[in-house]
């Protein structure tokens, strides 16, 4: 009912397009004040597929506006960007998400976006681009300027109309990503050394004063891989603190923060990851509360490798490899260094 009234109108839409869980307080959803809230995870929404990432929801919204305006096909240029966001946000790759990624990958080499073409060329892909490439190579480059300087650098790349200027912008963005990776390695090493000074608790809460807040989530993910614990990395941000968390199965990060929300000024996230802000004087209280509320067992702190069946070496032929390659998009590549 809403869409027809928006087409051709001057109405301002302030939307909440994200895949994070809706925060709760006293049994009520905490929703922003907005003209329109676009969030399939809110209780009043009956959209059948709630696993879309923020960019996926934005793409669906634009698609519907184009469709109702009679501009069919105009959305195709946006599919590679929706695919990149879907992979980099590590949402489940089934249903609509799988369709978005599959169609985005199919069209990425034919994109008319000069900036995206320049970035692909600079990264020197020798084979067709896969979902893993979106998560491990293209996505981190796009995110790097926003982590270290200004996210508009990536936006300007994709809005560039001159091929030579686009090539220069792409080179700078790739260089920025290399700088970001070096900072991440340094901070991960420093954090790991700090963690190893004492017996491992079930939840790691690490304060890194010198860590840039934009790489805190990557550092948390690296520590999670190294120690197999839920990890919160907290950094300075002006006169307060900001944190980013990465989790393991069995520990719902958003719910754990919700249980400790009296120590926080803001928080949001989902089972696997979260972000939050707090006042400096609340740091020790938050640490204690997170540890006290954690119910992980020792068994849950041991990483498990699951598989469907054992495969004999004689079964591994090119036919099987080709068949398995069809299942690639059902995995969720986790962007990292």
Predicted segment positions?
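N-terminal small/polar loop signature for handling phosphorylated ligands or for N-terminal nucleophile
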Residues: 9-10, 14-30, 38, 224
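A contiguous loop/helix-start segment that scaffolds small-molecule binding in enzyme catalytic cores
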Residues: 90, 110-114, 293-332, 336
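Short, ordered loop/turn segments at secondary-structure junctions
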Residues: 19-22, 41-43, 209-210, 236-239
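Single conserved hydrophobic/aromatic residue that forms the stacking wall/gate
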Residues: 1-8, 13, 330-337
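Hydrophobic helix-and-loop "lid/oligomerization" segment in the mid-to-C-terminal part
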Residues: 33, 67-284, 288
């Amino acid at each position: 009912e809403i869409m027809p009234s928006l087409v051709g109108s001057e109405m301002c839409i302030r939307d909440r397009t994200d895949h994070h869980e809706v925060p709760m307080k006293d049994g009520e959803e905490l929703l922003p004040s907005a003209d329109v809230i676009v969030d399939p995870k809110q209780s009043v929404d009956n959209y059948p597929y709630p696993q879309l990432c923020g960019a996926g929801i934005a793409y669906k919204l634009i698609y519907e506006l184009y469709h109702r305006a009679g501009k069919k096909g105009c959305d195709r240029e946006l599919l590679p960007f929706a695919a990149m966001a879907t992979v980099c946000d590590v949402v489940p790759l089934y249903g609509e998400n799988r369709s978005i990624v599959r169609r985005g990958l199919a069209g990425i080499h034919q994109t008319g976006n000069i900036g995206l073409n320049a970035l692909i060329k600079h990264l020197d892909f020798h084979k067709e681009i896969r979902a893993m490439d979106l998560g491990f190579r293209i996505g981190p480059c796009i995110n790097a300027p926003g982590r270290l300087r200004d996210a508009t650098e990536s936006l300007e790349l994709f809005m560039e109309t001159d091929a030579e200027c686009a090539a220069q912008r792409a080179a700078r963005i790739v260089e920025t990503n290399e700088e970001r990776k070096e900072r991440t390695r340094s901070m991960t090493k420093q954090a790991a050394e700090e963690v190893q000074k004492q017996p491992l608790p079930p939840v790691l809460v690490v304060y890194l004063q010198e860590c840039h807040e934009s790489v805190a989530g990557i550092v948390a993910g690296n520590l999670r891989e190294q120690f197999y614990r839920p990890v919160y990395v907290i950094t300075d941000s002006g006169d307060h603190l900001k944190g980013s968390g990465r989790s393991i199965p069995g520990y719902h990060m958003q719910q754990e923060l919700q249980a400790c929300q009296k120590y926080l000024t803001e928080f949001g996230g989902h089972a696997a990851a979260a972000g939050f802000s707090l006042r400096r004087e609340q740091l020790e209280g938050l640490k204690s509360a997170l540890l006290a509320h954690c119910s992980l067992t020792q068994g849950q702190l041991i990483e498990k490798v699951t598989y469907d069946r054992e495969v004999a070496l004689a079964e591994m032929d090119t036919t099987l490899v080709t068949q398995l390659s069809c299942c690639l998009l059902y995995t969720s590549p986790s962007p990292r260094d």
